[in-house]
Amino acid sequence: MNLINELKKKIIQNKKFIFNNKNHDLVDELKKKGILNNNILDAFNKIPRELFVNEKFANLSYENIPLPIDCEQTISQPYVVAFMIDCLKLKKINSVLEIGTGTGYQTALLAHLCKQVYTIEIFSKLYNQAKINHHKLKLKNINHMLGNGINGWNKNILFDAIIISATTESCPNKLLESLKNGGKIIFPKKYDFETQKLILLEKINKNKYITKTLFDVRFVPLLNKKST
């Protein structure tokens, strides 16, 4: 069973068990799970997740679970999003590249935490949804691209951090080349037997990286094709 079908099955099984109704409920849960960065918690408080989920799952917007979106993709579990962002140790002066915009929830969080966000989405439907969502929130520091994230931004920009929202067997070389020395990249790595683990890389120079393996996750695959 693929990830999307698993999510739908779990939602049907647990639809009566709703614990979080508002942003502050979700933020309280994130605190209990160890997310203590006040800037990240403030971003979660400000961004309405309900804007980014499908209408039929609106009542689950603030649950700490991933949810299906269009194009057989997902909006990630809030705790995993918060943890990944926390690992990057972002500053307000930073520029971040995001691979996999989806409907733009994580992008919006990043926009509150750094100077510029560059985000690439392969599906035109999601690309357009995200742009609309960000316009509604009046976020001015997000740069959108419709394309294959494996190819990077295709411009002479080096990033302080890169976050990949889909699983891959290895980090694409063009993304590694786009990272500044001292920068961090976080992504879910695919292993055998459908195992995935979150990986954090810190770039020392073009030939040296510090690698940290974190915990098991489940993400949709990183696609290598033309945008659709």
Residue ranges and their predicted role:
Residues 2-97, 105-109, 113, 126-140, ...:
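Class I SAM-dependent transferase core
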Residues 89-209:
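Conserved nucleotide-cofactor-binding alpha/beta core module
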Residues 206, 225-226:
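Short, solvent-exposed coil/turn segments at beta-strand boundaries
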